[in-house]
């Protein structure tokens, strides 16, 4: 797994957990990574670059949540955000943050990564759902945005 994929997955877990327990996303991210080093099982290490990328994504989503959610709501025809699965919504939030605020990451990379994360963490139809909405949003994003 690439460092950025690991970061995206950590960020998704933090945002999802934040939605469930209504806790600060950075605190949640820290707890998730700490849980990798606790317990009696062999520890999993979290790459420091992956953690830094996850933290950047989480902070970016939280700081720009209103603009991100507005884009998602605008393009999610027939789906209110309240009806969306929390996993799918947070995958969309992460990807929309990248599309809008990280011009250094190519659009196709952002979309492919979101689809792969949706396949891993979402329901059977999550990948196609995420792809459909992201395709609509990506088509409206200019390179300078």
Swiss-Prot record:
PANTHER family documented for this protein: ANTITERMINATION NUSB DOMAIN-CONTAINING PROTEIN (PTHR11078:SF3), N UTILIZATION SUBSTANCE PROTEIN B-RELATED (PTHR11078)
Residues in the signal sequence: none
Superkingdom as given in the UniProt entry: Bacteria
GO molecular function (one): RNA binding
Cellular compartments per GO CC: cytosol
UniProt name for this protein: Transcription antitermination protein NusB
GO biological process per UniProt: DNA-templated transcription termination; transcription antitermination
Taxonomic lineage of the native organism: Bacteria, Pseudomonadati, Thermodesulfobacteriota, Desulfuromonadia, Geobacterales
Xref: Pfam families: NusB (PF01029)
HAMAP family named among the record's database cross-references: NusB
Cited InterPro entries: NusB-like_sf (IPR035926), NusB_fam (IPR011605), NusB_RsmB_TIM44 (IPR006027)
CDD domains with a match to the protein in the record: Terminator_NusB
């Amino acid at each position: 797994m690439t460092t950025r994929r690991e970061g995206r997955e950590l960020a998704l877990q933090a945002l999802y957990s934040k939605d469930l327990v209504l806790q600060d996303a950075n605190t949640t991210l820290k707890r998730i990574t700490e849980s990798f080093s606790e317990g009696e099982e062999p520890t999993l290490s979290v790459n420091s670059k992956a953690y830094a990328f996850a933290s950047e994504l989480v902070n970016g989503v939280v700081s720009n949540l209103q603009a991100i959610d507005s884009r998602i709501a605008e393009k999610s025809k027939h789906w209110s955000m309240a009806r969306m699965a929390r996993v799918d919504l947070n995958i969309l939030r992460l990807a929309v943050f990248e599309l809008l605020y990280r011009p250094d990451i190519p659009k196709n990379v952002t979309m492919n990564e979101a689809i792969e994360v949706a396949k891993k963490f979402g329901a059977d139809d999550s990948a196609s759902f995420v792809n459909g909405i992201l395709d609509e949003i990506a088509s409206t994003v200019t390179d300078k945005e």
